[in-house]
């Protein structure tokens, strides 16, 4: 891993460690409660999947629990931030018994080949410096015909929505996030990382190059989020 990648991951980890207690609240308020429906769309894809599952960049298990509501298989929740994982463990849920938290790097997964029947990553691919390596790792740990589900921010294609959305990210969301968490810089980074993230068409090409086959590629909420479902 080069120094630039190390520095980037250290920065992201520090920001997530700092905002952990208000992370879910800002996500819900900042998305006008659309995040609930986005997670539901992901979780439904796991309904008939074979376990065990892996939820990457899991944060405090917000998506993990939604997946387990649909399919109570063994689920490993991996995140770079120990603070996120510890906070997730404080959530009272009968589903905790199916969940196994693990601190780790999504670009270097500590699992054997062909371990998981399905893998999810919500709003985490954007934060990984080496996306090709990450996708290759996802492919490696999935079983044959295993399911990969990615939920990630994207930019609306329509200029009528694109520019107001950019203004909202830079000023509205950063103000809200800064007010509630005390770390405005974390949400300025969020706005910047969304702008820099490749469009869905480019991510699709990367997934196919690694060896995945498209099951579903869908724009949600006027294009501010994209849902990718691909099969090994």
Where are the predicted features?
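N-terminal, positively charged/glycine-rich alpha-helical extensions of SAM-dependent methyltransferases
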Residues: 1-22, 169, 180
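Class I SAM-dependent methyltransferase SAM/SAH-binding core
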Residues: 54-108
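A short glycine-rich, Lys/Arg-flanked "PGG" loop and its adjoining helix->strand segment in the class I
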Residues: 132-147
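C-terminal alpha-helical "lid/dimerization" subdomain adjacent to the S-adenosyl-L-methionine
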Residues: 154-206, 216
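Core SAM-dependent methyltransferase catalytic element
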Residues: 211-232
């Amino acid at each position: 891993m080069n120094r630039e990648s190390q520095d980037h991951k250290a920065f992201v980890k520090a920001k997530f460690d700092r905002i952990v207690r208000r992370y879910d609240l800002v996500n819900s308020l900042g998305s006008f409660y659309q995040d609930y429906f986005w997670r539901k769309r992901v979780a439904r894809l796991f309904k008939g999947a074979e376990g065990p599952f892996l939820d990457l960049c899991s944060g405090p298990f917000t998506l993990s629990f939604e997946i387990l509501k649909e399919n109570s298989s063994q689920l490993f929740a991996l995140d770079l931030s120990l603070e996120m994982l510890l906070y997730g463990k404080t959530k009272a849920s009968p589903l905790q018994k199916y969940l196994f938290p693990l601190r780790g790097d999504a670009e270097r997964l500590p699992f054997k080949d062909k371990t998981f029947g399905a893998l999810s990553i919500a709003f985490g691919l954007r934060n990984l410096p080496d996306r090709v390596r990450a996708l290759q790792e996802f492919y490696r740990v999935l079983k044959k015909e295993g399911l990969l589900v990615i939920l990630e921010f994207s930019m609306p294609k329509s200029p009528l929505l694109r520019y107001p959305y950019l203004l909202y990210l830079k000023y509205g969301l950063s103000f809200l996030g800064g007010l509630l968490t005390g770390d405005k810089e974390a949400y300025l980074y969020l706005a910047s990382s969304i702008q820099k993230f490749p469009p869905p068409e480019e991510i699709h090409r990367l997934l196919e190059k690694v060896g995945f086959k498209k099951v579903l590629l869908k724009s949600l909420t006027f294009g501010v989020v994209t849902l990718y479902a691909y099969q090994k």
